[in-house]
Amino acid sequence: MKRTLRNPGNSSTVGDVHDVFFEYDVSNVGRKRPRTKEEGYYESESEEDEDQILNKEKKEGQSEDMFSDTSEDEKRTLPNDEAQKRRDFIENGDAERLAHKGLRNKEVLNDDSDDEDDNGKYSKLRYEDIEGQEDTNQANDLDADEEGSEISVPSSPKRMSFNLKEDMEEGDFDENGNFIRKNYDPESQYDAWLNGSVSNKKSIAAAREAEQKRKEMENRRRNQELEEFSKLPFSTVPEALSFFIARMERDESILEFLQRQSGNKKSYKKKKNNTAEGISPERKSADAFRKKLIELITAGLTFLEDKIGKEDIYSETRESLQRIYQKLTSNSWSSPVSYDDSNSSQYNFKWEFDDKTYGPYTASQIQAWSNEGYFTDAKHAAFIQLANMDEWMYPNNICFCDVVSLKK
């Protein structure tokens, strides 16, 4: 019988062959039940017997986890050969070999945790007992791999080399080979004072002695500074400021002023003038005066740092010192000596390796020649002295407006 798709009610006989479209007939579609495959166990016409089917299932079951907990229902369904095989596997020590390769049994982990919680009491291993075990374990793993095992563990963790002596300093190994780190902190002795636990009488005495020595050194340094300050040509801060302002140029810092006083920019050719060293007496005298002047300047800077509390005094300019002077005295700074004073001191000058001395001249005349570069642009070095003094000086070391400081 054949039923058409357009008219399912009509049917016609077309031989004994069923039409393929018959199963798509809507009127004949009902609930489909899952079909049960009866292959393997109960098919009598199968070519495989029951023993061959069980062997096939054994091979498929080898991919499962051997260490998973097996319920009682599963144990009943397992064949006797499979259960016996698992018992033989554990008794032969294969599980222990896998544990060395990184697999840990759940029961072993629980036992280890119980040992660690036993009030921290454990048996320590000596260095001689531990040394060489790393190589032994690696050799055992290699032997096991060569013999071959029924279950292979891919991507097992690699062993990392370590320094046993350093580890023994940081902790100890118990009987099971577990490393237990020490709680001692070598830096804790430096932080003990934070907890108020410093009660050692010897340490307290040493700290008191160190504090006393520090105070003695501070007092000694202070007394030395006061002794140096007593030799200065000034005793107050305004006098010290006036000393520097009178010698500095416009927009010149103290550091630049100190460099200018330290040496001449131009080097002169030294000629031998009946002296063994080839240095004139005037130059020796000028060098000695320059050395005293540099010591006086540095002592004056220390005096200002101590009195006004400025640590960056070397960066101060002439104008900034004038502002400090005005703030302290409420008056603007003015030159202590006038160039036009007829009673001002007289100066002499001479050229190096020249026996003739020129002068005396007033301070205004010497200052005018110095500003024009008469002394600095000459072929030979020039030296200037006060008429009533024996010392010779370089032109850049003279302050024409503060003769009193130079005499000291």
From Swiss-Prot:
SMART domains: GYF (SM00444). GO terms for cellular component: nucleus; U5 snRNP. Disulfide bonds: none annotated. One of its GO terms (biological process) is spliceosomal tri-snRNP complex assembly. Residues 344-402 form the GYF domain. Residues 1-161 are annotated as: Disordered. Residues 41-52 have a biased composition (Acidic residues). Residues 53-62, 73-109, 119-129 have a biased composition (Basic and acidic residues). Pfam families: GYF. Belongs to the LIN1 family. This is LIN1-like protein. It comes from Schizosaccharomyces pombe (strain 972 / ATCC 24843).
